[in-house]
C-alpha cells in the first residue's frame, strides 16, 4: 500500500523536490542571500512535508485498505466510512452499483427458481403418459418391436430423471435426509426399473453383498446407482453385472462391475466431465455425457468417493467408497 500511495502522490513529491532545489539554486546565484538559513528552511520544510505525507497516508489509505479487504458479498456495511469528497464519490458509486447488482441477482434467482419449478412440474406431468406408454409396450407381442420401443422408452425415462435431479442438485444440501439405508432394497428397486431393458439385452445381475446397510440419503444414493447401472447395461451384451459390497479399512465399498467393451485409458481421466462422450459409438447410442457427471456431483455432498477402473474389451468397475459413519456424522454436523 505504501508503494501505491507514493506512486499516486508522485507528482506532489516531485513538485516539492523541484521547489526545494529551485530555492537552493536561487540562493546559490544570489550572493546576498546566506545559504545556511536557506538550507535550514529547506530541511525544516522537507520534514514538515514528510510528516504531512505520513498523516495523509494513514488518513487516505484507511478507506482504500478496507475497500481492498472488502468481502465481495455485496454487503456495503463492511466498508469504511468515506471522509474526503473523492472517497464519498467512490462510496456512492459502489453503493449504487451494489444495489443494482443485488436487484439483478434477485431477479435472476427468482427467474431460475420459476424455471426450475416449471420444469419439475412438466417432468412430473410427462411421467403419467410415459407410464401409460410403458404399459402399452408391455402388452406388445412382437418381441423385436417391443425390445426397440422398450429401449427408446428407457432412454426417455432416464433423460427425464437426469433433468429432474440436475435441477435439484443445487439445492441438494437442503434436501438431504441421512439414515440407515438398506443397500439390497435400493438395488432391487433400480434393477426392477431396468428389467425390461436387461431382458432384451440378455443381462443378469449377481449381487454379492457382505454389507447391506449404509448411512446416506436413500433417494440420492438411488440416483447414483441408477446412473452406474444404466451405464453398465448400455455398454454390455448377454452378460452379468456383478455388484459387490464389503468393508475395507473401516469403510463400506460398493463395486459395480460389467463385462462390456470397457473404456479407453485416455478417456478414463475425463469420464466424469460434463458432456464428455468417449467415441463415435456413444453418439449413435445417444449418449449425452451427463449421467456419470451428475453421479459424481451428487456423490461429493454425500462424501462418497466415486472412482472407475476399466480394461478395454474386458469391462468396467465403478467403485463407491462410503465414509466412516462417525466421520460422516461429524462432517454433516448431525
Curated annotation (Swiss-Prot):
It is found in: Cell membrane. InterPro entries: 2-comp_sensor_kinase, HATPase_C_sf, His_kinase_dom, HisK_dim/P_dom, HisK_dim/P_sf, Sig_transdc_His_kin-like_C. GO terms for cellular component: plasma membrane. It catalyses: ATP + protein L-histidine = ADP + protein N-phospho-L-histidine. It is a multi-pass membrane protein. Its EC number is 2.7.13.3. It is an enzyme of class 2 (transferase). Its main location: membrane. The keyword Nucleotide-binding applies. It holds the Pfam family HATPase_c. GO terms for biological process: cellular response to phosphate starvation. The chain crosses the membrane at residues 13-33, 35-55. Keywords: ATP-binding, Cell membrane, Kinase, Membrane, Nucleotide-binding, Phosphoprotein, Transferase, Transmembrane, Transmembrane helix, Two-component regulatory system. Residues 121-326 form the Histidine kinase domain. GO terms for molecular function: ATP binding; phosphoprotein phosphatase activity; phosphorelay sensor kinase activity. The modification Phosphohistidine is found at residue 124. PANTHER family: HISTIDINE KINASE, PHOSPHATE REGULON SENSOR PROTEIN PHOR. Member of the two-component regulatory system BceS/BceR involved in the regulation of bacitracin resistance. Activates BceR in response to extracellular bacitracin. This is Sensor protein BceS.
Amino acid at each position: 500500500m505504501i508503494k501505491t500511495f507514493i506512486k499516486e502522490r508522485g507528482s506532489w513529491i516531485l513538485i516539492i523536490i523541484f521547489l526545494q532545489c529551485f530555492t537552493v539554486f536561487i540562493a546559490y546565484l544570489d550572493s546576498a542571500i546566506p545559504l545556511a538559513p536557506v538550507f535550514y528552511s529547506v530541511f525544516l520544510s522537507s520534514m514538515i512535508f514528510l510528516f504531512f505525507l505520513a498523516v495523509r497516508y494513514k488518513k487516505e489509505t484507511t478507506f482504500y485498505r478496507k475497500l481492498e479487504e472488502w468481502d465481495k458479498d455485496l454487503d456495503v456495511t463492511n466498508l469504511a466510512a468515506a471522509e474526503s469528497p473523492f472517497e464519498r464519490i467512490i462510496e456512492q458509486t459502489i453503493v449504487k452499483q451494489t444495489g443494482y447488482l443485488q436487484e439483478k441477482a434477485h431477479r435472476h434467482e427468482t427467474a431460475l427458481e420459476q424455471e426450475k419449478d416449471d420444469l419439475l412440474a412438466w417432468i412430473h406431468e410427462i411421467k403419467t403418459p410415459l407410464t401409460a406408454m410403458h404399459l402399452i409396450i408391455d402388452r406388445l407381442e412382437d418381441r423385436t418391436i417391443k425390445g426397440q420401443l422398450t429401449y427408446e422408452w428407457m432412454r426417455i425415462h432416464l433423460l427425464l430423471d437426469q433433468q429432474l435431479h440436475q435441477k435439484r442438485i443445487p439445492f441438494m444440501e437442503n434436501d438431504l435426509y441421512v439414515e440407515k439405508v438398506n443397500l439390497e432394497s435400493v438395488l432391487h428397486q433400480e434393477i426392477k426399473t431396468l428389467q425390461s431393458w436387461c431382458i432384451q439385452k440378455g443381462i443378469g445381475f449377481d449381487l454379492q453383498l457382505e454389507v447391506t446397510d449404509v448411512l446416506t440419503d436413500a433417494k440420492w444414493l438411488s440416483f447414483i446407482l441408477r446412473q452406474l447401472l444404466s451405464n453398465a447395461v448400455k455398454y454390455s451384451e448377454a452378460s452379468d453385472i456383478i455388484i459387490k459390497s464389503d468393508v475395507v479399512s473401516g469403510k463400506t465399498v460398493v463395486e459395480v462391475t460389467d463385462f462390456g467393451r470397457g473404456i479407453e485409458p485416455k478417456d478414463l481421466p475425463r469420464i466424469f466431465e460434463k458432456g464428455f462422450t468417449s467415441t463415435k459409438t456413444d453418439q449413435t447410442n445417444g449418449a449425452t455425457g451427463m449421467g456419470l457427471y451428475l453421479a459424481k456431483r451428487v456423490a461429493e455432498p454425500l462424501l462418497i468417493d466415486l472412482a472407475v477402473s476399466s480394461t478395454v474389451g474386458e469391462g468396467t468397475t465403478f467403485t463407491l467408497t462410503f465414509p466412516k459413519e462417525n466421520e460422516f456424522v461429524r462432517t454433516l454436523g448431525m
